[in-house]
Amino acid sequence: LDGLVGSEMCIRDRDNTMATQAICQPANYGADIIIYSTTKFLSGHGNAMGGCVVDAGKFDWNNGREFEKLTEPDTSYHGIKFFETFGNLAYINFCHASALRDLGTTMSPFNAYLTLTGIETLNLRMQKHMSNADEVANFLIKHDKVDSVSWSGFKKNKSYQLAKKYFKFGFGSVFTISVKAGFDGAKKIVENCNLFSHLANVGDTKSL
């Protein structure tokens, strides 16, 4: 996609929630803004809600027509010009100074504490997540009732070479399966699973 952009004024935004910075660092491959749902793998225990915006600090925001919030005076902050004051870190400082103030999306202190505690073990947890995914995916692909398993760790998967290129280790811990029994069969599997929980979260201490 970056090759198709063709404009230096296009911001490259990446959601790195599923890989995390433990195995993939988009800023090293041209991303300008990286976002995370910290509720998932970063906190790692399904007990803290939050989100994160990371500014790679490489994008030139000095374009009045496109980014006037960053280049023109902000009257709510005594006329500060964010780009003039912070340079290429204008966007992240604007997010902190204005967006948080206006929208109120501030993480609670206890959620922040739980998230930071979880991040301390991120590297080890991601390795275990991926080794578990490897075993389960390889078990399922051989099952006579499974039609297909889509996981970047399989050499025949269309994302295999990309995962090898961009991931420091492993192939991620999330995959999808298609069962031969179709929708009704898949529904029956979900309803009768005991070890795996049918929940909206990922990256938990539980198998989801």
Task: Map each language-model feature to its residues.
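Single conserved hydrophobic/aromatic residue that forms the stacking wall/gate
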Residues: 1-6, 11
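Generic detector of well-ordered alpha-helical packing
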Residues: 3, 16-17, 41
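Active-site core of PLP-dependent enzymes with the aminotransferase class I/II
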Residues: 7-8, 19-25
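Hydrophobic beta-strand scaffold residues
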Residues: 12-13, 34
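Active-site beta-loop-alpha junctions enriched in small/polar residues
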Residues: 17-19, 154
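Active-site C-terminal subdomain of aminotransferase-like
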Residues: 33-174, 178-190, 195-205
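Glycine-rich phosphate/pyrophosphate-binding loop
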Residues: 208
